[in-house]
A protein has these predicted regions:
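Intrinsic, short, N-terminal disordered tails of RNA polymerase sigma-factor systems
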Residues: 1-241
Length: 241
């Protein structure tokens, strides 16, 4: 799937770094929910990086919890807008954290929303690439998080519209072209004409790309950064630095 052409729907005054601004402005009753969402979104890319740095699974889980807890605390105590791309900012913060006295901080309590360790390790095994650097593992995991969130939203929209079955049938072709004969085979399987499948796939791809852009918009500071971040996303998925 190639990067998407520029669109004007993104309002960066409302979407840029929205997760971080939520943490900064959260009142006490809202802090738990804000921290939970931060943890759920970015937990695994951080965990994958720490694991590739050579830490055992239990230690990597403790480091990830302590790091995200510290990030949330730092953001709530400052109203300054962190500069640049969230992906790069988070990695720089993580490297600084690992270079510091993280062992004392890792003794803190559990972050709400923390994924269970068996789930993290199952994903680590399934996504492991021999010889992959910590940074590339982080970037690839971050890209997969963005795509996964976009896909979940696409499925939800299709379900609300009563088209979940069609969406699931065409999902394998959102990022690649069908092989010769696959349209006809799928047409017979679900009872829809091939031309209707072609049109449905075109609409699903367009909406999927829009949703991915919306997810990326939450992690960058300006519209000018969108195309560069999309290129970085697909480069990470291709295994390029």
């Amino acid at each position: 799937m190639s990067p998407v052409a520029d669109r004007s729907f993104t309002d960066f005054t409302q979407t840029r770094w929205s997760m971080l601004r939520q943490l900064q402005s959260a009142r006490a009753p809202d802090v738990r929910d804000a921290l939970t969402e931060l943890a759920v979104r970015y937990w695994y890319p951080v965990y994958a990086y720490v694991r590739r740095c050579g830490h055992r699974s239990e230690i990597a889980q403790d480091i990830t919890q302590a790091f995200l807890r510290q990030i949330a605390d730092d953001l709530r105590s400052s109203h300054a807008q962190p500069p640049g791309k969230f992906r790069e900012w988070l990695l720089a913060k993580l490297n600084a954290f690992l270079a510091g006295e993280w062992r004392d901080l890792a003794e803190g309590g559990q972050v709400p929303g923390a994924p269970p360790l068996p789930q993290l390790e199952a994903r680590n095994r399934s996504e492991h690439v021999p010889g992959e650097s910590p940074e590339l593992a982080y970037r690839r995991s971050f890209a997969l998080e963005v795509l996964t969130r976009g896909l979940k939203r696409l499925r939800a929209e299709a379900g609300d519209a009563g088209h979940l079955g069609m969406c699931e049938a065409l999902e394998p072709f959102l990022t690649r072209e069908p092989l010769p004969g696959q349209y006809d085979e799928l047409s017979r399987k679900i009872g829809v004409r091939p031309l209707a499948l072609v049109m449905a796939l075109k609409r699903l791809r367009q909406r999927f790309r829009e949703l991915v852009r919306e997810e990326l918009a939450d992690t960058i500071s300006s519209a000018e950064e969108m195309e560069a971040e999309q290129r970085a996303l697909f480069a990470a998925l291709d295994g390029k630095h």
